[in-house]
């Protein structure tokens, strides 16, 4: 949690997309949903070279904004970097674990100490558990139907991850196969925006059809 530094979840499993999403589901069930999630650019989180990831779609399906740190700028995630540093100094550098089960047990014990017993100067010498506030957004693990605002073109993504708009065949991502996206003119310049649910996911040049960026933002 950004404001309180409370460690909501430590998942000690092989780092795959399904494990990551399941870990977030468990965290959301227990602590509620945030308005946004900041992550690094690991392949399970960000799909810059190959469209979009299932993790990004999972967040957007639950009205959570995916945010990625700038590449090669770890200071964007300064708090989590310090968290990792503390974990290494206090636990990982001094222990060899027989397997993931042993590692998980040790990490959960360390997490409890970090949250409940360790004061932080930035928190007025309080512990993260003393200042953390549970989110009121309940996670139901159910994707609610979404109705796009009328007046703009809505197109279904084909089985290769492409959509045809005007005279352009545009690649979005296999992640959105059989999903519907909406095209809107950009009021600020000669381009159009591609929206998934209530998020802008890409911008294309209206003249050339060239993608300008694939940056997710709220509509």
Q: What does each of the following model-derived ranges do?
A:
Residues 115-219:
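C-terminal, beta-rich DNA-binding module of retroviral/retroelements integrases
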Residues 2-102, 106-108, 112, 203-210, ...:
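RNase H-like DDE/DDD metal-dependent nuclease/strand-transfer catalytic core used by mobile genetic elements
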């Amino acid at each position: 949690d950004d404001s309180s530094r409370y460690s909501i979840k430590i998942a000690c499993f092989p780092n795959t997309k399904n494990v990551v999403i399941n870990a977030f589901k468990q965290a959301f069930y227990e602590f509620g949903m945030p308005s946004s999630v900041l992550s690094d650019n690991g392949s399970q989180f960000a799909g810059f070279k190959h469209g979009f990831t299932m993790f990004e779609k999972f967040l957007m399906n639950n009205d959570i904004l995916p945010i990625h740190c700038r590449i090669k700028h770890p200071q964007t995630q300064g708090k989590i970097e310090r968290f990792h540093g503390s974990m290494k100094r206090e636990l990982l550098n001094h222990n060899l674990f027989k397997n993931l089960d042993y590692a998980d047990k040790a990490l959960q014990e360390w997490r409890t100490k970090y949250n409940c017993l360790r004061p932080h100067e930035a928190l007025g010498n309080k512990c993260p558990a003393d200042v953390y506030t549970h989110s009121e957004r309940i996670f139901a693990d159910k994707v609610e139907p979404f109705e796009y605002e009328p007046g703009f073109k809505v197109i279904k993504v084909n089985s290769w991850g492409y959509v045809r708009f005007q005279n352009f065949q545009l690649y979005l991502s296999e992640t959105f196969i059989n999903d519907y996206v909406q095209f809107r003119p950009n009021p600020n310049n000669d381009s159009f925006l591609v929206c998934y649910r209530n998020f802008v996911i890409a911008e294309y040049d209206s003249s050339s059809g060239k993608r300008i960026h694939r940056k997710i933002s709220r509509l």
